[in-house]
Regions:
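Extended, low-polarity segments enriched in aliphatic/aromatic residues
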Residues: 1-172
């Protein structure tokens, strides 16, 4: 989702970002149901920007209440992940990296060619949101993904991206 730009503040962490050590290649970061090309210019080596709602930076006190729960990508959330809700545009929030762990990604474990092909289909679908060809690409992705089963959104213990994004938000 997106909020109007005048209601947001842009922060650029650059090389100080926790994402920097895993930012070796261009265009590797992903989130769910968004065109990855948009994120490629925002989250890349040496840049790493976040767009947050202006309101929390204009108040005297913020109450951030922890809720102890598990999260598929971040593990335990406590109060750290609460700040994800301050986001002004989801394209600024990397949730995983493309590819399996054997290829330097963290979308899934190991090297799984059918999952990689399914990821390509998801990327193609996300470039066609709102068009009739979207459903064709999503169906192809689902069929390919069934070969190995599981998920294509980095929902496993080896996700090394989400915790870094959450920690960056808490450092702003």
């Amino acid at each position: 989702s997106r909020r109007s730009a005048e209601r947001c503040v842009l922060f650029t962490m650059g090389r100080e970002s926790c994402l920097e050590p895993i930012s070796k290649d261009e265009g590797i970061f992903r989130n769910t149901c968004y065109d990855s090309r948009d994120m490629a210019s925002i989250q890349r080596r040496g840049k790493h920007s976040f767009l947050l709602c202006r309101e929390p930076f204009e108040v005297d006190v913020i109450l951030n209440l922890p809720k102890l729960k598990a999260h598929a990508k971040a593990g335990i959330t406590a109060a750290l992940k609460n700040l994800v809700g301050l986001n002004g545009d989801k394209n600024f929030l990397p949730h995983h990296r493309v590819g399996g762990s054997a290829l330097g990604g963290d979308c899934y474990e190991g090297l799984k060619p059918f999952k990689r092909a399914a990821e390509v289909c998801v990327d193609m679908a996300n470039r066609r949101i709102g068009r009739s060809s979207y459903s064709v690409w999503i169906k192809d992705a689902a069929a390919l993904n069934q070969v190995h089963g599981g998920d294509l959104e980095g929902k496993w213990y080896g996700n090394d991206t989400t915790w870094r994004m959450v920690l960056d938000l808490n450092r702003l």
